[in-house]
Amino acid sequence: MKFFLATLFASAVSSIAVDRLIPGAQIIPESDTRALLRVGGHHDKYHDRRTITIRPSRNDTDDVSRDFLWGIKHANHGGRLLLKKGEKYVIGRKLDLTFLDDIEVQLDGELKFTDDVSYWQENNFYYDFQKSITFWRWGGKDIKIFGTGLLNGNGQRWYNEFAGQEILDPDNEYYRPILFLTENATRISVEGITQLNSPCWTNFFIQSKDVSFDDVYIHAFSTNKSALPKNSDGFDSLNVDGLTVTNTRVDVGDDCFSPKPNTTNIFVQNLLCNNTHGVSMGSIGQYPGVMDIIEHAYIENVTLLNGQNGARLKAWAGQDVGYGRINNITYKNIRIENTDAPVVLDQCYFDIEAAECAQYPSQVNVTNILFENISGTSSGKNGKVVADLVCSPNAVCSDIQLKNINLTSPAGSPPEIICEGVQGDIGVECQASAD
């Protein structure tokens, strides 16, 4: 009798599990190593988990966002969603993934968003900070995304239609989605994947803790020379404690790495930035009456090629802006080549006339900054100037040190370092701005 009841119960459980499946999906138990091997879900590096697969898209308009959400829910609490190598998964509907707890997503295929501009501009997650929107948002705790696959923002149409516009124009209403966004996430890691052609920022982390990226390639390019990617930053953050980026390449045409207000405990190592606006702290101090901070950052072994800026600190000035501090930042072992402004403190951000900046200077203090072992060449665009550190008269700039700086300019020698308004000895000879 007991055997009969046990068999009946097992049969019922099996039936329930099968009934829960959607067409094309599969649930593989953690113990079924052979089945995991067949689908590419067994790894030496990671422990086996209950693994979920879903059907791929048949073409670029076959939206599997409902299947994807089903897979995420069934992989939650200790499982893994596997997106298979050689397959494409098209997402055409916004997704709220802020309920996650102990989940892995193995991205070996391509996860691609539709370029239905009218849909996405009406259906998205909106954030007041710089009028940001996103296709989806990830949140919860203990979230791992890894693999060799592609997260594709399908940005070309967005680039074409945004050409000639500016994200920070108060009249701008052409909002473009961020490719990957976390909100209220704790311990989220991304490893090994490629992120391609985000319509706007590539990554934005909000109100999150312990975010890490390792061995990721971020690329944004356009097939239309008159409509290049804009604002396709590699990394942005807001109210984040613990942000780590290692062994990563970024080629996007805008900021390579640019934590924004209230980001603390930052670690960057072995980062390659090509065709970017540099590794920036900020911008901060944008919003009236609001205090922003960026604090405790260690940036080392970074290569910056063919860019607008190298190592940059940036803060807003103007009539209606905020205040704050950039504190305890180290840039060490930085190689810079063919870059307009290799080292720069910009306290007249954003796109502000010199007269207005002088009338309404930045109120962001810049303290305890170390630039050490900085080498390479500027592009010569700014003449012989290779470092420009001009502090706002309404801010405190102190304990700023330059050590072992070996930067040259094709415009001639000796290279020039500008410093103005900085308290104390900065460690190298410098001169006042000619402006």
UniProtKB/Swiss-Prot annotation:
Glycosylation, residue list: 59, 184, 224, 262, 274, 301, 328, 365, 373, 406
Keyword Glycoprotein: yes
Cross-referenced SUPFAM superfamilies: Pectin lyase-like (SSF51126)
Domain of life: Eukaryota
Top-tier EC class: hydrolase
GO annotation, cellular component aspect: extracellular region
Major localization class: secreted
Listed Pfam families: Glyco_hydro_28
EC number(s) per entry: 3.2.1.67
Keyword Disulfide bond listed: yes
Entry's Gene Ontology BP terms: cell wall organization; pectin catabolic process
Location of the protein in the cell: Secreted
Molecular function GO labels: galacturan 1,4-alpha-galacturonidase activity; polygalacturonase activity
Cleaved signal peptide residues: 1-15
Disulphide linkage map: 256-273, 391-397
Catalysed reactions listed for this entry: [(1->4)-alpha-D-galacturonosyl](n) + H2O = alpha-D-galacturonate + [(1->4)-alpha-D-galacturonosyl](n-1)
Entry function: Specific in hydrolyzing the terminal glycosidic bond of polygalacturonic acid and oligogalacturonates.
Protein name: Probable exopolygalacturonase B
